[in-house]
Amino acid sequence: MIIYATEVETINSFVRLESLKELYSLVWIFVPIFSLVLGIITGVLVIAWIERELSAGIQQRIGPEYAGPLGILQALADGTKLLFKEDLRPSRGNTPLFSIGPSIAVISILLSYSVIPFSNHLVLADLNIGIFLWIAISSIAPIGLLMSGYGSNNKYSFLGGLRAAAQSISYEIPLTLCVLSISLLSNSLSTVDIVEAQSKYGFWGWNLWRQPIGFIIFLISSLAECERLPFDLPEAEEELIAGYQTEYSGIKFGLFYVASYINLLISSLFVTILYLGGWNISIPYISIPYISILELFERDPIFGTTIGIFITLAKTYLFLFISIATRWTLPRLRMDQLLNLGWKFLLPISLGNLLLTTSFQLFSL
């Protein structure tokens, strides 16, 4: 009986160990996801504060200064206010479409972060088709905006949703052609491989210098995809009140507010990855032992990951500065001007750039 009891206790201890292993594995699956979500929320708060301060400086006025030191908690206060506001719904609208629209817009943008490498050791999913996965997922967001506009049963909202769909289609094609040019130069669709291909040649190996035309087209197309001035036709205040957001209030309106900043952040991150070398730390005219730094990254992954995150975010916020300054300095385009720019100028130029890149790659074989 004593031996039998001992065997039972041993079996129970093994069962407990196996259950603990399964629990730990589940925890470690969700830890990077929650860390990424926390980082995104922090990034959105920082972007909102930078835009308020920068816009105040451009317009020569005082920005937020009461909520926290230098008004750094103003965005958090605005989000808290929207969280506790009443969630109104149009009485004659399509309630399912009206409710699902904001969620589709936010989730489709959040999923794009899964293929963004902050260093060669920090990426949720290093896929062979990572860059195309981002394009495919980002094309779902306009469907949510169109659903929101149609479900609101409001002519301003519906027109805003139609404008969002038309604008997305017009600028998604030039953006995709620019991505194809980068993929041809890197011989890969993986975001990690694209950054490593640029890192081989240091600063002058960045795709910014190898694809200057594609960089300008990608920059304009990404601003149009984010629906920022001068491309904010779907929510033009003077024409459509707030576009597809007209009937929204409370947390649903806050989701659109957050989605716009998340989309701006992810566009800036992809500009950094595709054209600015990602976590590449080479600086021109300054002698940096790049090989020794790579060896240090391999020896100490934690240090390499920390430095990679810092460099990637530094380049990203530099592009964010350009995007915010563009919003507060340029006037809004008309709808016909926006479509003409996309179809008559950016599309032919991006197609020509792709043909030139293809020819160069063929002759270099």
Curated annotation (Swiss-Prot):
Pfam families on file: NADHdh
Record's keyword annotation contains Transmembrane: yes
Gene Ontology terms for molecular function: NADH dehydrogenase activity; oxidoreductase activity, acting on NAD(P)H, quinone or similar compound as acceptor; quinone binding
Entry's localization field: Plastid, Chloroplast thylakoid membrane
Membrane topology: Multi-pass membrane protein
Chief subcellular location: plastid
GO biological process: aerobic respiration; photosynthesis, light reaction
Source organism superkingdom: Eukaryota
EC number(s) per entry: 7.1.1.-
InterPro entries reported in the protein's UniProt record: NADH_UbQ_OxRdtase_su1/FPO, NADH_UbQ_OxRdtase_su1_CS
Keywords linked to the UniProt accession: Chloroplast, Membrane, NAD, NADP, Plastid, Plastoquinone, Quinone, Thylakoid, Translocase, Transmembrane, Transmembrane helix
GO cellular component, one term: chloroplast thylakoid membrane
Annotated function: NDH shuttles electrons from NAD(P)H:plastoquinone, via FMN and iron-sulfur (Fe-S) centers, to quinones in the photosynthetic chain and possibly in a chloroplast respiratory chain. The immediate electron acceptor for the enzyme in this species is believed to be plastoquinone. Couples the redox reaction to proton translocation, and thus conserves the redox energy in a proton gradient.
Name this polypeptide is given: NAD(P)H-quinone oxidoreductase subunit 1, chloroplastic
Naturally occurring in which organism (per UniProt): Arabis hirsuta
Record lineage: Eukaryota, Viridiplantae, Streptophyta, Embryophyta, Tracheophyta
